[in-house]
Amino acid sequence: MAITFSVPGDPVPQPRPRITVRGRHGHAYVPKDHAIHAYRQAVAIAARAAGLVEATAPVSVIVDAVFARPKSHLTKSGVKASAPALPRPDVDNLGKAVLDALQEVMGDDTNVSRLLVEKSWGT
């Protein structure tokens, strides 16, 4: 059974955590105003709406991250030669953000046996 869903807007990669030290103990956190929190919530809502439930067997996750191309990459005749071929965020951070969001819906992500992440520019 395949469940497909999409999340509007540009994908948000998992950021590096900030570290704070209190006494001898360090604490890692992501600031509350970071866009990743809204993105995770949007992914979880879309997954639930598509019918995703808790995973009890191995699952495959395919992430197709499509980014809007900035106007600065374009000319009247098409894409500038100097424009990057691929969007900036690393695919591992994009995959991590989606898996963290899906944990709210399907439980622990240890049931994910295959993760395929692709990134590209949209039209």
Q: Each PLM stretch: what is its role?
A:
Residues 1-123:
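Acidic, proline/glycine-enriched N-terminal capping motif
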